[in-house]
Amino acid sequence: MNTIVVAQLQRQFQDYIVSLYQQGFLDNQFSELRKLQDEGTPDFVAEVVSLFFDDCSKLINTMSISLERPDNVDFKQVDSGVHQLKGSSSSVGARRVKNVCISFKECCDVQNREGCLRCLQQVDYEYKMLKTKLQDLFNLEKQILQAGGTIPQVDIN
């Protein structure tokens, strides 16, 4: 094990995860999720987040189809998708996705199709940004472990 390389990777990991919180991508729920991961379940967070991203993709696609026809929008179906997306984003600590869902729900409540389309575009953008950033984070974790190090705990508060 090269302790200098491990220390650099760990520092990079800590800085990166702090930046994700500072930029509003993540909230404390992500920290709580990370606490559930241990040596027996080393990929727990990555697996949960992967399921979240799969759900996001499906929900965004379903809502997009529901909003396609301007004369026949099923706002109840869109609202149901927004509700599911908000719940799952809250459970993994995807703060920006969750925040867009709040605005999205307001647009559904007043049956504002244009507002819903804007929110759909924004939630798709935020989910894709977060996916890229968390993939980078998980790759950094793998590099640390492959170098013989341990994943550092990061105190965000």
UniProtKB/Swiss-Prot annotation:
Gene3D superfamilies: HPT domain. PROSITE patterns: HPT. One of its GO terms (biological process) is embryo sac egg cell differentiation. The modification N-acetylmethionine is found at M1. The gene is AHP5. This is Histidine-containing phosphotransfer protein 5. Histidine-containing phosphotransfer domain (HPt) contains an active histidine that mediates the phosphotransfer. Its main location: cytoplasm. Two-component system major event consists of a His-to-Asp phosphorelay between a sensor histidine kinase (HK) and a response regulator (RR). In plants, the His-to-Asp phosphorelay involves an additional intermediate named Histidine-containing phosphotransfer protein (HPt). This multistep phosphorelay consists of a His-Asp-His-Asp sequential transfer of a phosphate group between first a His and an Asp of the HK protein, followed by the transfer to a conserved His of the HPt protein and finally the transfer to an Asp in the receiver domain of the RR protein. One of its GO terms (cellular component) is cytoplasm. One of its GO terms (molecular function) is histidine phosphotransfer kinase activity. Pfam families: Hpt (PF01627).
